[in-house]
Amino acid sequence: MEFSAVRSSVYRTLAEAFTYTRAGAGPFGISSADYNEAFDPSLSPQACSLRERAHAQEDQSSIFEELMRFYEFFGLKRDENAEMPDHLGVELEFMHFLTHLESPVADQPDDLASIRRAQHDFLTRHLGRLVKGVHGGLKSQNPQCLELVETTFDFINTELALVKERAQA
């Protein structure tokens, strides 16, 4: 499996793990109760929000506007029953999509560079900040939740280093 496909697969796995309905079935095996206690502030006062707006200085509307521009630029639309556009699972799923786009254009330098610029911009402007906020704000001592957040934090930091290196090349 090529590198972009591996990266895409990791993003997909992490996106599913941060989704309430799929968290228990994934490799981290987080129960619904533990998920709510760790990540749903509407149900647990000590929970860490998985929404970017909780970890950013900008107001919600400007965050949403920029996120929707990213998604729509690549032809993606939000289903009205979907998570909010600033939810960690949605942002990870978008990076799954962007990394998946690398393979078909691997032999087209301009298109590949454009996709990699989008990855760089999205990671540095949105996903990196969100993951850092969740990592710093997690209060749960549940081992599966801790492992999920640590794994995501480490992976995103590796990805940030990769996209910065590629941007300088």
Q: Model regions: which residues?
A:
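Surface/interface-facing alpha-helical segments and adjacent flexible terminal/loop regions used
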Residues: M1-A169
